[in-house]
Curated annotation (Swiss-Prot):
It is an enzyme of class 2 (transferase). Its EC number is 2.5.1.145. The gene is lgt. Keywords: Cell membrane, Membrane, Transferase, Transmembrane, Transmembrane helix. Disulfide bonds: none annotated. GO terms for biological process: lipoprotein biosynthetic process. It is a multi-pass membrane protein. The keyword Cell membrane applies. This is Phosphatidylglycerol--prolipoprotein diacylglyceryl transferase. It is found in: Cell membrane. The lineage of its organism: Bacteria, Bacillati, Bacillota, Bacilli, Lactobacillales. Pfam families: LGT (PF01790).
Length: 278
């Protein structure tokens, strides 16, 4: 195989002197697609579609800020000497767990204020969220980040990867494990599984689609994170791996507890929104 092409340009085009990055285009596309699918499902679950748009307008900027804050905090050794780069999110450097923390707080407050069951809203969001995560990893691909350990060209070719992926994994003179791809495929598979199962009658109580998402994502992220070389570290520990373990165990624990102790009181996911303002 002739591998003569260089790395892909992370900049898509220039607009009036402003560089538009593929990273931003890919993330924005993922958000738009996720919003469209969430609106469609909200209608089926008796939630005003405008609520989804309003929620996105609040949650998205908060998620971006907390995702960046999370990343900067764990990379403070670098950013304390490069303060001007803290706001440069278009260059990459946002953490999904940070985004989930910020967005989760917004979802809770928004739903309480608008008479929407929090668990139901999380169920609606979960499948499209993991889809957006899977798409978003291709932004990391364009920036040549979220890659894994050094590997060989022979190994990458054995995976039957397209030429452009193999060449993009040539970083600093060495081929790298395409961990972005592993996680992207895992996320997209999770999206397919959740979308296939969530409309099964009496299968999910409200909250269980979301908890299934957490279990699925945390399980895959733990193993992918172990292959990466750019993990955020704290006291020599991969932060995302520990968070994955906590979320995996926690979600299973909550799922079992709710099924055993609250099963008869939990509405089915398909029942949709049963709340109304007083």
């Amino acid at each position: 195989m002739n591998l003569t092409l260089g790395a892909l340009n992370p900049i898509a085009f220039n607009l009036g002197g402003i560089q538009v990055h593929w990273y931003g285009i890919i993330i924005a596309s993922a958000v738009v697609l996720a919003t469209i699918l969430a609106v469609q499902e909200a209608k089926r679950r008796r939630i005003d579609p405008d609520s989804i748009y309003d929620l996105i307008l609040w949650a998205l900027p908060v998620a971006i800020i907390t995702a960046r804050m999370y990343y900067v905090i764990f990379e403070w050794g670098y950013y304390q000497n490069h303060v001007d780069e803290i706001v440069r999110v278009w260059d990459g450097g946002i953490a999904i767990y940070g985004a989930l923390i910020g967005a989760g707080i917004v979802v809770y407050l928004f739903c309480r204020a608008n008479w929407i069951p929090v668990w139901l809203m999380l169920d609606i969001i979960a499948p499209v969220l993991i889809m957006a995560q899977g798409i978003g990893r291709w932004g990391n691909f364009m920036n040549q980040e979220a890659f894994g350990r050094i590997t060989s060209l022979t190994f990458l070719q054995s995976l039957h990867l397209p030429h452009f992926i193999i060449q993009q994994m040539l970083i600093d003179g060495a081929y790298r494990q395409p961990t972005f791809l592993y996680e992207s495929l895992w996320d997209i598979l999770g999206f397919i599984v959740l979308m296939s199962l969530r409309h099964k009658k009496h299968l999910f109580k409200q909250g269980e689609v979301f908890l299934s998402y957490v279990i699925w994502y945390a399980f895959g992220r733990f193993f992918v994170e172990g292959m990466r070389t750019d993990s955020l570290m704290l006291l020599g520990i991969r932060v995302s791996q520990w968070l994955s373990v906590i979320l995996f165990i926690g979600a299973i624990g909550i799922l079992v507890f709710r099924r055993k102790s609250m099963r008869e009181r939990l509405p089915d996911y398909l029942e949709g929104n049963q709340l109304s303002p007083k």
